Amino acid sequence: MRRGVEEAEIDRLPIDLLAHIFSLITCFRDLAQASRVCRKWKQGVEESLARREKLSFSGWKMDDESTTRLVFLAYSLKELDISRSRWGCQITDYGLHQLSTAKCIGNLSSFSLWGSTGITDKGVIQLISRATSLEHLNIGGTFITDASLFAIADSCPRLKSLVLWGCRQVTEDGLRTVVNKCRKLESINVWGMRVPLNCFTALLTIRPALQIEPKGVVTVVLNENRFPIWPIY
């Protein structure tokens, strides 16, 4: 009898309250367990995800399926972080292709794929073609090439910051194209890239107010005319 009373009390909780409670939970494992309690709790978990404007999978062991399943429920999402961490967010081109069909992708203002070594230009281009509202993009530590930058230049007119940390297959052509076409671009991180210093001179010629990170690059550009010695990883 006692068990029946407890279930009745749970049933009396309104969905809005359940959704609010679940929105305070940051552990996706806990959310998954809560969704299995009963049908009403599952609905509460789904509504809590639908209200979220930020999702970060950094630090969680996610794959294409689990990532896309959660993002598909997050209709109001504005900021998405699926950076690879020590546990590894194993997103691939297939996952990016699936994400590109999510309802929230067109409204994303911030997206991080930092360190996602399982992705290539193919997946990035597919997703970027739909993420046309991006203002902040981090694709550092990946193996993208100029092809991805050309897609960014064509699809992201609102872009303000771009992190290309360690993207050693990107060349001067890709950088110039992005800076030239993304007219709202304010900062770009080029740490660890294999490009000559005169490339940065060209970028500053196109957009004098552009902040090039790390900050020391601009100082060297203004005082020397040689190739930078970037750290090897």
Model-derived regions: residue spans:
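Residues that line or immediately flank small-molecule/substrate-binding pockets and catalytic motifs
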Residues: 25, 59, 84, 115, ...
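C-terminal capping region of solenoid repeat domains
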Residues: 1-4, 17, 44-45, 64-65, ...
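Intrinsically disordered, low-complexity regulatory regions of eukaryotic transcription factors
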Residues: 22, 26-29, 100, 128-131
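N-terminal adaptor-interaction module of cullin-RING ubiquitin ligase components
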Residues: 1-93
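Short loop/turn motifs at secondary-structure junctions
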Residues: 51, 76, 104-107, 133, ...
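Conserved hydrophobic beta-strand positions in leucine-rich repeat
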Residues: 55, 80-83, 108-113, 134-139, ...
